[in-house]
Structures are given as structure tokens and as C-alpha cells.
Amino acid sequence: MPGRWSAETRLALVRRARRMNRALAQAFPHVYCELDFTTPLELAVATILSAQSTDKRVNLTTPALFARYRTARDYAQADRTELESLIRPTGFYRNKAASLIGLGQALVERFGGEVPATMDKLVTLPGVGRKTANVILGNAFGIPGITVDTHFGRLVRRWRWTTAEDPVKVEQAVGELIERKEWTLLSHRVIFHGRRVCHARRPACGVCVLAKDCPSFGLGPTEPLLAAPLVQGPETDHLLALAGL
């Protein structure tokens, strides 16, 4: 019903967005960063490696990397060839190696070897933009942040929370709809939903907890039995149970 959404007021949009966030919280009660890490430095490194790669691929790569490079100084003094060899499976390994060495050097020279906990300082580091900074702030320091990755941007546009393509504008628009304390969890929920249910080409509309509030309902199969096989991930049984299957 295109008319229903085109006539939506600002207040109605805020209410719908927050209702959808609550539904996502029910669908994904245990969300988390899917990159493996134990320290802010490890998360910064893993997030840099995740560009144009998958979390699964990064998580297969980082155990050996983290065992070899434990501190910012280790990265600052890394042998480039050795570092490139370790991170090669994540793709674009030459650029990423340069970013990691630069990251280590910047942390040693300007921050005493420690990852800073503010946006303005994080974005001055090599390889760290707002997306990476928000991942670090939200998951290593508990500071709310909205992570606009490919899934997040695709879904919030699909939901008509915003029409913006620029990640910074998406972050700002969503931040005005959802309470700040929810930002990090919202980011995880949306990304989980994009990976498991709301796929780019064939979303599982028929089993989606957001169906009644989604302007794009019908892009994928709306019949539950046809949509069910499209659901992916360890939460599949829970998601199908919510759909009555």
C-alpha cells in the first residue's frame, strides 16, 4: 500500500522505527559483534580486516595474527611481508597491511599504545572511518554507536527510515529515530536480520517479524512455507517459531 507509507508523518515514522527495533529485539535477544576479539586493539584490527571480506573469514585469520602481534608496537614494527602473508585470506591485504602498520605507529606515537575511546580521535587513525570507530566504541568501550555497514544501509532504506545513501547521513537519520542507548544493539539486530532474514535478493518476507511495519513487504515470498527455507543462521528455529512454524 504505497499511499500508507507516503503519507507517514514524522511522529508515525519514529513510532514505527521504535516498534520495529522492539520486534528485532524479540527476534534476536542475544546479539553481539560477530568478529572475535578480546581487546580494543584486536577489535580495531579485525574491523579493518573485515572490509570487503566476511566476519567468518576474518575470524579464521585473526587467531594466528593476534598470537603474533599483541600490542600496537608489534604492529608498528611489523615486517610488511610477514604481515601481508598472515592477512592475505581477507583480501586487499597490501592496503590492509599498510593500515595496520600505520595504526600501530599512530597509537604508539599519539596515544601511548592504547586505542582511544572517542570518535574524534579514532577517525584520525589509519584505516579507521566512522563505521569502524562506531564498532570499536560500541563493542569495546560500551559507548553507543550506529554501525552503518552494507546490510544496515540496505535495510533502513528498505524500511524507509531514510532515503540517504551516504553512511554518515544514514547514521544521523537513524540516530534521530532511535534512542541513543539502543544504538549499538540496534546495529547488531539490523545486521543480524540482514544476514539471516532480509536478504538483498530474496528476503524471507513470509516469516519476518517486521512484516506489518515494512513498506517493502512482498519483495520476497510472502507465503511462510516458501519463505522459511530462506532463513539462515543459528537462530533459524527461534525465528520460525515466532512465525508460527
From Swiss-Prot:
It holds the Pfam family HHH. Residues 119-138 form the HhH domain. Its cofactor is [4Fe-4S] cluster. One of its GO terms (cellular component) is plasma membrane. [4Fe-4S] cluster binds at C198, C205, C208, C214. InterPro entries: DNA_glycosylase (IPR011257), Endonuclease-III-like_CS2 (IPR004036), Endonuclease3_FeS-loop_motif (IPR003651), Endouclease-III_FeS-bd_BS (IPR004035), HhH-GPD_domain (IPR003265), HhH_base_excis_C (IPR023170), HhH_motif (IPR000445), Nth (IPR005759). The keyword Iron applies. It is an enzyme of class 4 (lyase). SUPFAM superfamilies: DNA-glycosylase. Binds 1 [4Fe-4S] cluster. GO terms for molecular function: 4 iron, 4 sulfur cluster binding; class I DNA-(apurinic or apyrimidinic site) endonuclease activity; DNA N-glycosylase activity; double-stranded DNA binding; metal ion binding. Transmembrane segments: none annotated. The keyword Chaperone does not apply. It catalyses: 2'-deoxyribonucleotide-(2'-deoxyribose 5'-phosphate)-2'-deoxyribonucleotide-DNA = a 3'-end 2'-deoxyribonucleotide-(2,3-dehydro-2,3-deoxyribose 5'-phosphate)-DNA + a 5'-end 5'-phospho-2'-deoxyribonucleoside-DNA + H(+). DNA repair enzyme that has both DNA N-glycosylase activity and AP-lyase activity. The DNA N-glycosylase activity releases various damaged pyrimidines from DNA by cleaving the N-glycosidic bond, leaving an AP (apurinic/apyrimidinic) site. The AP-lyase activity cleaves the phosphodiester bond 3' to the AP site by a beta-elimination, leaving a 3'-terminal unsaturated sugar and a product with a terminal 5'-phosphate. Has a preference for oxidized pyrimidines, such as thymine glycol (prefers 5S isomers) 5,6-dihydrouracil:G, 5-hydroxyuracil:G, 5-hydroxycytosine:G and urea:A. This is Endonuclease III. It comes from Mycobacterium tuberculosis (strain ATCC 25618 / H37Rv). The gene is nth.
